[in-house]
Amino acid sequence: MESLTLQPIELISGEVNLPGSKSVSNRALLLAALASGTTRLTNLLDSDDIRHMLNALTKLGVNYRLSADKTTCEVEGLGQAFHTTQPLELFLGNAGTAMRPLAAALCLGQGDYVLTGEPRMKERPIGHLVDALRQASAQIEYLEQENFPPLRIQGTGLQAGTVTIDGSISSQFLTAFLMSAPLAQGKVTIKIVGELVSKPYIDITLHIMEQFGVQVINHDYQEFVIPAGQSYVSPGQFLVEGDASSASYFLAAAAIKGGEVKVTGIGKNSIQGDIQFADALEKMGAQIEWGDDYVIARRGELNAVDLDFNHIPDAAMTIATTALFAKGTTAIRNVYNWRVKETDRLAAMATELRKVGATVEEGEDFIVITPPTKLIHAAIDTYDDHRMAMCFSLVALSDTPVTINDPKCTSKTFPDYFDKFAQLSR
């Protein structure tokens, strides 16, 4: 297996422009495909997850033109749900942002579909979404294990009315249903059961739907009403924000070993909840400065925090490795959904933090981290999880090297991450 050893870094300083957000890119591509009119998407992320969505859209009869650098895409909207005459199999890798929204969207029109992916995708739950879609008369069957992909979907349309959806495992189930609801056969009301996790990701969904001309009435995240008679209309141009989760590594690096790092492509008005990572970093002692389209982080004396990270679970992973440089014991709480991501991130994070010398307590939905007096050089396993690889790059900000196994797994969201990280390192 390929590995990459990062030597100790003395100083982190400079400017980095973020690749487009994965969450925004795949949502916008799907809505552009369903909308009437042509949409020109700029700053699109070029990564595995986006490629899986684009490949699926091609098979579904959507025409688009992709620039040579793959960051600008002109999508010719269908102006309706997908209609296919031949049975189709769509392979979606490990892209939850493609699997969940497409599973809902393919129920709307006509066609016979199988949705499948990599082995890890078959371990990632989708039952709560399927249950909700079935309430709206969707025809879906599990081909292997109950509640998990692969799925067979017969497109027959989604009925109007009220459905309940469990929000406690992943917000992607609600996102998927919300994006399909305007093309259902009438007014749709979605009632949430349990505590809705990752609410900021729902805000992203609602914001993008609004840009494509659809209004959703949000009753305090407990009930969502999608009035009848709406359809998606291209906004013409659509700028994909920089990926706020990807910003977290550079901001944390500056907090630990700045200098200062300026991250461009997101700012104080970002629609992504993961910009709240900077607030958590500030609580630890970093200096943070906000602009309209940038964030600057500077080094500070870092202290441990004990916080609920339910709203920003992806960026919270970066706090786990930042905790290695903080005084005291850090607790990251209410992150059960780490267990159903690209890998079981609670187990993986605990295992790898212990390798570098940390004392770790792992609970069902929390992790508590006490740093060692000196970090140990270890080979970090990444579990085919892009965020594990990027989080553990921060270990090199000590006086100890770190070896990252399978560094190319960052291609899921940030193919040139290690190049960008090296450019800022002194």
UniProtKB/Swiss-Prot annotation:
Residue positions of the active site: 314
GO process annotations (BP): amino acid biosynthetic process; aromatic amino acid family biosynthetic process; chorismate biosynthetic process
Stored InterPro entries: Enolpyruvate_Tfrase_dom (IPR001986), Enolpyruvate_Tfrase_sf (IPR036968), EPSP_synthase (IPR006264), EPSP_synthase_CS (IPR023193), RNA3'P_cycl/enolpyr_Trfase_a/b (IPR013792)
GO molecular function: 3-phosphoshikimate 1-carboxyvinyltransferase activity
Keywords: Amino-acid biosynthesis, Aromatic amino acid biosynthesis, Cytoplasm, Transferase
Pathway assigned to this chain's UniProt record: Metabolic intermediate biosynthesis; chorismate biosynthesis; chorismate from D-erythrose 4-phosphate and phosphoenolpyruvate: step 6/7
GO cellular component: cytoplasm
Alphabetical list of PROSITE patterns matching this protein: EPSP_SYNTHASE_1, EPSP_SYNTHASE_2
Residues involved in phosphoenolpyruvate binding: 22, 96, 124, 172, 345, 387, 412
Highest taxon of the lineage: Bacteria
Protein family (similarity comment): Belongs to the EPSP synthase family.
Protein name in the entry: 3-phosphoshikimate 1-carboxyvinyltransferase
Organism: Vibrio cholerae serotype O1 (strain ATCC 39541 / Classical Ogawa 395 / O395)
Gene that encodes the chain: aroA
